[in-house]
């Protein structure tokens, strides 16, 4: 679930036997701490290890370790989930890290505008010491990310003018 409605998460966990998986990257720790079974996170595609740490720590009743991992992830989550749709930012970052061949997304999504890309990059500059993530290798390619998945044809993607 990725609605961002904590009271709804609580209701589902209290009133059903459903296994609840958090899909709200910002609230994964709170959801796990009240009984969510796991997570499906966009940001985990960029840095999976801290999420494993959070899940294991919650399962071991070690809130301090889970909280430390959550806090370390905050600027990365902000970079991925705030300025453009998460899939757009995740592909932009993964391509900049050399992990995928193209940052292009399927229409109707389009790559980040210059200002959005700059905001993503500014937030990434605040990320420090996340296990499995080396941002010193980050080389963003704003031109490759522009537009949608189709060639730049009038009416289908952003035009140059």
Set out the residue ranges of the language-model regions.
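Flexible, glycine/charged-enriched surface loops at secondary-structure junctions
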Residues: 63, 67, 84-89, 130-139
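Conserved short secondary-structure transition element at the edge of the structured enzyme core
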Residues: 32, 74-107
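Alpha-helical structural motif
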Residues: 50, 69-72, 86, 116-123
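Short alpha-helix boundary/capping motifs
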Residues: 40, 58-60, 94, 101, ...
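Catalytic alpha/beta core domains of metabolic enzymes, predominantly
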Residues: 1-74, 78-82
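Basic/polar N-terminal segments that are highly enriched at the extreme N-terminus
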Residues: 135-161
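Flexible C-terminal active-site loop/helix
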Residues: 99-137, 160
